[in-house]
Structures are given as C-alpha cells and as structure tokens.
C-alpha cells in the first residue's frame, strides 16, 4: 500500500515561504495568484494490507514525527 501525506501550516500561522513565493510570482507578472501556501508531501510504501490498520499507523507517524501538530495540519491518502 502506498501512503501520501501532505503537511501544511495551519491557517493563521505565518507562512514565510508562501509569502516569498507569492512575491516572486507577482514580480514575474503572475498577478492573478493569491493565498500561496507552501507545504511538504511525503510518499512511502507501507507493508500493510488492511486499510484501517494502515491509516492508524500513518496517523501515528504523522502525530509523532511527520507533522508538528501544534502549527501544522496533515492529510493522508492511501492507495492500494
């Protein structure tokens, strides 16, 4: 099973990278861009057939290592 974890700063937390990317895009005359957020995507294989067990394991990974849950939110997608 393949897991895709997306991690982004929570709404209300200053996204300095997002601001920098937005500024760079507007300086390149891409003026129709707004609300730029920069995050990270972690993709890995998981040796687990049971989807519920896989989701539980990946959630635990996010809570303990992959995301700083004080300032970040995450989403998990499992692909068989």
Residue positions per predicted region:
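Short amphipathic alpha-helix segments
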Residues: 12-28
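Short Gly/Ser/Thr- and Asp/Glu-enriched loop/turn motifs at secondary-structure junctions
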Residues: 37-41
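Solvent-exposed residues in well-ordered beta-strands and their adjoining turns
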Residues: 8-10, 47, 79
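A short linear hydrophobic-aromatic micro-motif
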Residues: 29-34, 73
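Short glycine-/aliphatic-rich beta-strand segments at the starts of folded cytosolic domains
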Residues: 1-11, 42-43
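Small, basic N-terminal interaction modules of short regulatory proteins
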Residues: 5, 11-12, 31, 50
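C-terminal structural segments of small proteins and small subunits
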Residues: 52-80
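Short, conserved charged micro-motifs
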Residues: 14-16, 49-56
């Amino acid at each position: 099973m393949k897991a895709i974890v997306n991690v982004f700063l929570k709404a209300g937390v200053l996204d300095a990278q997002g601001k920098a990317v937005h500024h760079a895009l507007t300086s390149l005359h891409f003026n129709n861009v707004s609300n730029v957020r920069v995050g990270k995507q972690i993709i890995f294989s998981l040796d687990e057939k049971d989807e519920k067990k896989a989701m539980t394991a990946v959630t635990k990974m996010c809570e303990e290592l992959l995301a700083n849950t004080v300032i970040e939110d995450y989403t998990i997608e499992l692909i068989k």
